[in-house]
Amino acid sequence: GPNGAGKSTLLKAIFGLVKVTSGSILLDGEEITGLKPNALVARGIGFVPQTNNVFPSLTIRENLEMGAYQKQESSVEGIDMVMGLFPDLKSRLEQRAGSLSGGERQMVAMGRALMMKPRVLLLDEPSAGLSPVRQDEAFLRVSEINQTGVATIMVEQNARRCLQICDRGYVLDQGANAYTGTGRELLEDPKVIDLYLGNLGK
């Protein structure tokens, strides 16, 4: 949806960062509306915000370990899993996150969320501010994460690219769901093209 449609607010509501005033949020049939973020993390929900998504004074390794703070076992297995998805980070684990590029910070943020082995991953604008090449990498990583069995809910301004890789899409308008369908259906829907995709949909 367009700017101000409520996309990021929706993710924040799911993750307990803003108050839900109506409706319900269910996870496998369990009511989770209004739970605090730490309770949602314990239930297997990870969240990657668009900005301020790393601890800049900590190393990459320390950032990843922060994501496993609720797990009792060693974080080594989790770090190995994250390095499999983001091999560019492997030789730089002791580098401070504050020195990384936007795309590299996004990798660290996604990796930290994955350290808890979430059932659901919420991603807010994973391609924001990235070069076209880095955007392609970000979408590839999102697809790979999803293929590991993690359900992924992604808010994304690059609607065309997002719809190309998603199972289902939801177009928001003024806080309400205006259109729903598979990615292909929405890419080919004349109303969605005219109202939201413009030339991007052609």
Please provide the spans of the model-predicted regions.
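Glycine-rich phosphate-binding loops of nucleotide-dependent enzymes
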Residues: 1-202
